[in-house]
């Protein structure tokens, strides 16, 4: 019996840096008698000996993998054959601040230009104190900000007087009033409802949970439904909610607070049903913040404010780059070179 048995064998060769020696001729100008030097080749200007590929890799490994300077120095030596000190790593991050912040500003402008914006926040640590990391995102851009306050002024400053059509957020007070209207995160409401049920409410919370789950199920099917069908579903959900909220207040404390809040914010629950571009949760924001939570737990965050600024800008570049089909390394390298990472159109 004859035939062919084919299989693949995959391996990595030893990784070694490419070192390019630059020789620049120097002399004396015969006219003015001043010393002159030959210009440096483009991309090989004097300064740091490390090229953009190393800079992007260092930032990538530190930001996305939460590798400390000490471990990163050892990893670069043992895996990549590159001797680099912790001080040099810090210098790479410091130099990256200007181009990364510039790229982040472009990303922020893209978020502000969006009709639908989502936002969330989590705590951060800077110089041993509690700060806050905010994320503001659209379908095409994700912007991170690390600041010392959780107040609504953070968002007000970010928006620069611009008001999106719809603001997607949880019920935190600092998230209120930034859009023309709000879409409340139904995932957060389901958690609040679950808590009320566990606390003993057997009337309002279970019925409200059924309405929310029905709304979520409709939201998952929106792309396959006609506009007229969605309008009918929206009217039906409003009727169910009106009937539920026209009843007596619950006697259990957490259920009563939820009941009163829903009476106040009832208009903010089902906007997504007839707006396919509006999510029914702000889970995208929570996913965008999750790597930062891991980074905080692993590294205990930042010893200096500039480190927080670089991290937020790099996180914005990486997350936005992924929306546009770029890897973290590709997005960072483009941003460091001043190349746009967002596709136009």
Which residue ranges define each predicted feature?
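Short, conserved DNA-binding cores of transcription-related domains
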Residues: 1-30
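Catalytic center-proximal scaffold of phosphoryl-transfer enzymes
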Residues: 19-345
């Amino acid at each position: 019996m004859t035939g062919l048995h084919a299989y693949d064998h995959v391996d990595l060769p030893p990784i070694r840096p490419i070192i390019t020696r630059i020789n620049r001729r120097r002399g004396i100008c015969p006219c003015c008698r001043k010393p002159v030097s030959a210009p440096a080749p483009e991309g090989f200007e004097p300064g740091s000996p490390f090229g953009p590929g190393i800079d992007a890799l260092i930032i990538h490994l530190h930001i996305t993998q939460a590798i400390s300077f000490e471990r990163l120095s050892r990893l670069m030596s043992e895996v990549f054959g590159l001797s680099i000190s912790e001080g040099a790593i810090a210098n790479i991050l410091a130099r990256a601040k200007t181009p990364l912040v510039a790229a982040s500003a472009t990303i922020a402008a893209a978020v502000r230009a969006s009709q639908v914006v989502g936002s969330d926040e989590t705590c951060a640590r800077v110089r041993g104190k509690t700060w806050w990391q905010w994320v503001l995102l659209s379908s095409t851009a994700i912007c991170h900000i690390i600041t010392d306050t959780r107040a609504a002024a953070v968002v007000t400053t970010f928006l620069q007087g611009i008001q999106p059509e719809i603001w997607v957020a949880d019920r935190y007070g600092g998230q209120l009033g930034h859009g023309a209207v709000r879409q409340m995160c139904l995932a957060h409401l389901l958690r609040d409802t679950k808590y009320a049920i566990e606390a003993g409410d057997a009337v309002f919370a279970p019925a409200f949970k059924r309405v929310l789950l029905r709304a979520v199920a409709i939201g998952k099917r929106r792309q396959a439904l006609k506009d007229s069908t969605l309008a009918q579903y929206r009217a039906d959900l409003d009727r169910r909610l009106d009937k539920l909220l026209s009843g007596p207040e619950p006697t259990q404390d957490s259920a009563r607070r939820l009941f009163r809040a829903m009476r106040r914010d009832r208009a903010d629950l089902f906007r997504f049903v007839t707006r396919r571009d509006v999510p029914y949760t702000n889970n995208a924001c929570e996913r965008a913040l999750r790597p930062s939570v891991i980074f905080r737990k692993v590294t205990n965050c930042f010893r200096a404010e500039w480190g927080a600024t670089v991290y937020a800008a790099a996180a914005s570049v990486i997350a936005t780059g992924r929306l546009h089909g770029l890897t973290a390394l590709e997005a960072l390298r483009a941003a460091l070179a001043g190349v746009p990472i967002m596709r136009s159109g």
